Amino acid sequence: MSNLTGTDKSVILLMTIGEDRAAEVFKHLSQREVQTLSAAMANVTQISNKQLTDVLAEFEQEAEQFAALNINANDYLRSVLVKALGEERAASLLEDILETRDTASGIETLNFMEPQSAADLIRDEHPQIIATILVHLKRAQAADILALFDERLRHDVMLRIATFGGVQPAALAELTEVLNGLLDGQNLKRSKMGGVRTAAEIINLMKTQQEEAVITAVREFDGELAQKIIDEMFLFENLVDVDDRSIQRLLQEVDSESLLIALKGAEQPLREKFLRNMSQRAADILRDDLANRGPVRLSQVENEQKAILLIVRRLAETGEMVIGSGEDTYV
């Protein structure tokens, strides 16, 4: 079997385990690795019984070794990847895997901390460090932490998030040193997180007044960047432009009480948009509730609108709702 490369062995194994399992394996590979294996697979004309038997025997042997209690998982993983992908690609993939693993516990710690405690922990760091940390957090947690900063720091950090392009190698050592202290020795990976989409998602979760102030601050620095962020945002009032079928799908997911409170702060055209996509009975009940429900706090209205927007974003990402043509500008 000495004439078989690691890629050849991987192809034989993938063709042996069946289409469904092979597809699952591909989901965990990079685009380049998928292309390499696919190209090799396309060139396969015949696999001898001996080649098949040898590859399966080697795989079984290594799988049994992996099951031993004294196995070094990292060394085993490195060995398997080198055999399958070659030294260079294996090193790159393993680095990504281990960095992602190391990132998780430190970031999860911040995700589960009270926003005030997390804000106190990082507020004195350089704004770029803060931005780098926040892009790795859940969007709602990042928004809550930003809300606790003073306006100047909040605007500075948000601008850095919007222009974030990953951690440059030259800055990695300094960043790691800071995070070693803040996050109990865990490192943030050099990632492609951040950027306009991340900024828009975080701003969408801020209070309306803070949203407007942040957008204004970014616009003063870079008008084009501010517009890109706005284009990525989707505001509650923009639902008036969504097609009826999408509204009907949204109504299947939204709690009636949540919708009632959200619409208390909406203009009449948007109210009518929802009403005409309901059954007659449901529409009549909602009209009565809107007319008879007393005043509702603005903060409560905003919270329900933002909760509905999270559902909108989820449905849009799965293709169950259409929220814009790509040419629309939301302001």
Curated annotation (Swiss-Prot):
Its main location: membrane. It comes from the Bacteria. The record marks 160 as: Part of the EHPQR-motif. GO terms for molecular function: cytoskeletal motor activity; identical protein binding. It is found in: Cell inner membrane; Bacterial flagellum basal body. It is a peripheral membrane protein. The keyword DNA-binding does not apply. Keywords: Bacterial flagellum, Cell inner membrane, Cell membrane, Chemotaxis, Flagellar rotation, Membrane. GO terms for cellular component: bacterial-type flagellum; bacterial-type flagellum basal body, C ring; bacterial-type flagellum rotor complex; plasma membrane. A motif (Part of the EHPQR-motif) lies at residues 125-128. GO terms for biological process: bacterial-type flagellum assembly; bacterial-type flagellum-dependent cell motility; bacterial-type flagellum-dependent swimming motility; chemotaxis. Belongs to the FliG family. Forms dimers and other homooligomers. Interacts with MotA via residues in its C-terminus. Interacts with flagellar brake protein YcgR. PANTHER family: FLAGELLAR MOTOR SWITCH PROTEIN FLIG. FliG is one of three proteins (FliG, FliN, FliM) that forms the rotor-mounted switch complex (C ring), located at the base of the basal body. This complex interacts with the CheY and CheZ chemotaxis proteins, in addition to contacting components of the motor that determine the direction of flagellar rotation. This is Flagellar motor switch protein FliG. It comes from Escherichia coli (strain K12). The gene is fliG.
